[in-house]
Amino acid sequence: MVVPGILTSDGAGVNLRRIIGSPQLNMLDPFLLLDEFGTNNPEDYIAGFPPHPHRGFETITYMLNGKFHHQDSTGNEGHLTDGSVQWMTAGRGVIHSEMPEQTEGLVRGFQLWLNLPKDKKMIPPAYKDIPAENIPRVDFPGGTAKVIAGEFMGATGPGQPHTGMFYYDIELQSEKELSIPVIDGWNAFLYVYEGIVLNNQTVEKDQLAVLGKTGDCRIKAGGLGAQFIVVAGEPLNEPVARGGPFVMNTREEIMQAFNDYKNGILV
C-alpha cells in the first residue's frame, strides 16, 4: 500500500504535508499522525505552533534542517536544531509551544505521534531533547542509518518509547539494497523524502509505503539514491478516541480532557 501525503496547515498556519492522520491513512497502530514540514519560505513556518494542549500520546519531532524553540507547562525548554530530536510524552496533560528561531532559510523535518497504552495515558508528562551528536550513525556498504529509537546493526537509539518501536533515518546510494528486520506482527512503514525506493513496488518522493507484517523488509534505492525514514511499532489493539489535541480510549475521556483544559486543570 502506497499513500501520498496531502498538503494542509496546522498550528498558526504552518504549511505541511500530512501522511498518517489523513483520509488515505487515518492511523497505523500505534502511530496516530505523521507530518512532514519543509520549506524555504518563512511565510510557511514563521507563525509556528503557539501554546496548545495534548493528552494521551507522545510526540517525536525530528528536525532535518532549521531551528525551533520548545517551551511547556512543566517548565521544560529546548532547542531543536539540524539533526536533533524532541521527544515529548504528553501523558495526563501538557501545554507546549514550538516556535521558529529563524526568520529565513530552510525548515524541514517530521513530527510523529505515538499512541500511549491505556494504562500509561495518564502518566506524568516528560520531555527530552536529543541533540544530533547523540543519535548513533551506522555506516554500512551502500549507505548510512541514523538510529533515533530501537536497535539497528548493533547501535541503539536514544529515544525511549513507552511501547515497542523503532525509528531510523536511512540514506541509500544508487541501486543499493538493504534488509531491515521487522518483528512479526508489528506495523511498519517507510516514507521517502528524497529519491525513489523499490519495495515490491515503487515508492516515490513524498510517498509512504505500508510494509508487510512478517519477515525482513528488503529495500532498494532508485538510480539517484534515496533518503527515507523507516518506522515500526507494536500495535496496541486498543480503542482509539480522538478529539483535536487529545487521544484517549473513549469519548467520555476526550470530553473530560476538554473540560480539564477549559477549567485549567489539564496540567
Task: Show where each model-derived region lies.
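Jelly-roll (double-stranded beta-helix
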Residues: 1-267
